């Protein structure tokens, strides 16, 4: 955002751990994104409401970060990346405030004003003729239940959701993104094109069929499947591994150099897997 588009980033740490906030601050200084000698040259603003602070302070941090983003957009006329970590802590802080005010809790103990409070934050994240605000929000999902009121209310406001899977992480596949639970309103043929859309739907259908077959495989084994289903399983496993990608930021931890892959190459690769061109190759 800062280098390619001349924009700025605002990070709102809602209920952030002190050590994590400090580690991010030091990393921003080392990468010269924050310049303490000349603050006007900085490309990042950090706002924290730490875990040990009262719920009122934690609840206002997300709104404070958003107000700063609006300033950069409306006054400085810049494009802004707003990162909120974690939006669930915003809901949690609101629940604590609601309890202190003596309000009757609603479903699963959340505050009765959950939808209104979430809307007061999310509906301000918008673009104008002067600039734009693009928001990336980390969402904690209690007990991995996507129907929990907190993540469900949040996702209703988001254009796209990227769901991380413990199962994929256990297989050592990173990023552990679950393509079946993840969604995007941008995945439409008139936006991404017919080829991209059709390929994505084919990938999802193959993975969905593999998911349906997993119970049968666990009980009876792979040999009991039909030839067609065995082929589907083999292709789905290739797709799972093809969806992984070494990150530049994770080089220190994995020892694997990061790689960029062009979108056109990715689509072509999926088409080759789905068509059976790569059936002769091993999963790895």
Swiss-Prot record:
Q: Name one GO cellular component term.
A: chloroplast thylakoid membrane
Indicate yes or no for the key word Nucleotide-binding: yes
Q: What Pfam families does the entry give?
A: ATP-synt_ab, ATP-synt_VA_C
* PROSITE patterns xref list: ATPASE_ALPHA_BETA
Task: Kindly report the protein's main subcellular placement as a broad class.
Answer: plastid
Q: Which GO terms describe its molecular function?
A: ATP binding; proton-transporting ATP synthase activity, rotational mechanism
Q: Name one GO biological process term.
A: proton motive force-driven mitochondrial ATP synthesis
Q: Kindly state which reaction or reactions the protein catalyses.
A: ATP + H2O + 4 H(+)(in) = ADP + phosphate + 5 H(+)(out)
> Which InterPro entries does the protein's record reference?
ATP-synt_VA_C, ATP_synth_F1_bsu, ATPase_a/bsu_AS, ATPase_alpha/beta_chains, ATPase_F1/V1/A1_a/bsu_nucl-bd, ATPase_F1/V1_b/a_C, P-loop_NTPase
Q: How does it assemble?
A: F-type ATPases have 2 components, CF(1) - the catalytic core - and CF(0) - the membrane proton channel. CF(1) has five subunits: alpha(3), beta(3), gamma(1), delta(1), epsilon(1). CF(0) has four main subunits: a(1), b(1), b'(1) and c(9-12).
The UniProt similarity line reads: Belongs to the ATPase alpha/beta chains family.
Q: What is this protein called?
A: ATP synthase subunit beta, chloroplastic
| Source organism per UniProt | Asplenium nidus (Bird's nest fern)
Taxonomic lineage: Eukaryota, Viridiplantae, Streptophyta, Embryophyta, Tracheophyta
Gene that produces this protein: atpB
């Amino acid at each position: 955002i800062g280098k390619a588009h001349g924009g700025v980033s605002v990070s709102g740490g809602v209920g952030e751990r002190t050590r994590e906030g400090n580690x991010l601050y030091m990393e921003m200084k080392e990468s010269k994104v924050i310049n303490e000698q000349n603050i006007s040259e900085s490309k990042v603003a950090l706002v924290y409401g730490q875990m040990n602070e009262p719920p009122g302070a934690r609840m206002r941090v997300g709104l404070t970060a958003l107000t700063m983003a609006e300033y950069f957009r409306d006054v400085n006329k810049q494009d802004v990346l707003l990162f909120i970590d974690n939006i669930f802590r915003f809901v949690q802080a609101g629940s604590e405030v609601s309890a202190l005010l003596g309000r009757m809790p609603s479903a699963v103990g959340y505050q009765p004003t959950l939808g209104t409070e979430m809307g007061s934050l999310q509906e301000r994240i918008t673009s104008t003729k002067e600039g734009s605000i693009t928001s990336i929000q980390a969402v904690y999902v209690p007990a991995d239940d996507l129907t929990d009121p907190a993540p469900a209310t949040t996702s209703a406001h988001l254009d796209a959701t990227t769901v991380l899977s413990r199962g994929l992480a256990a297989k050592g596949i990173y990023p552990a993104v679950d393509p079946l639970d993840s969604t995007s309103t941008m995945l439409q043929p008139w936006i991404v094109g017919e080829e991209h859309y059709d390929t994505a739907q084919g990938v999802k259908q193959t993975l969905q069929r593999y998911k349906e077959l997993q119970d049968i495989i666990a009980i009876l084994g792979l040999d009991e499947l039909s030839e067609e289903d065995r082929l589907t399983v083999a292709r789905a496993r290739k797709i799972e591994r093809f969806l992984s990608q070494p990150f530049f930021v994770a080089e220190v931890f994995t020892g694997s150099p990061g790689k960029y892959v062009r979108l056109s190459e990715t689509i072509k690769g999926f088409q080759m897997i789905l068509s059976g061109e790569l059936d002769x190759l091993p999963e790895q």
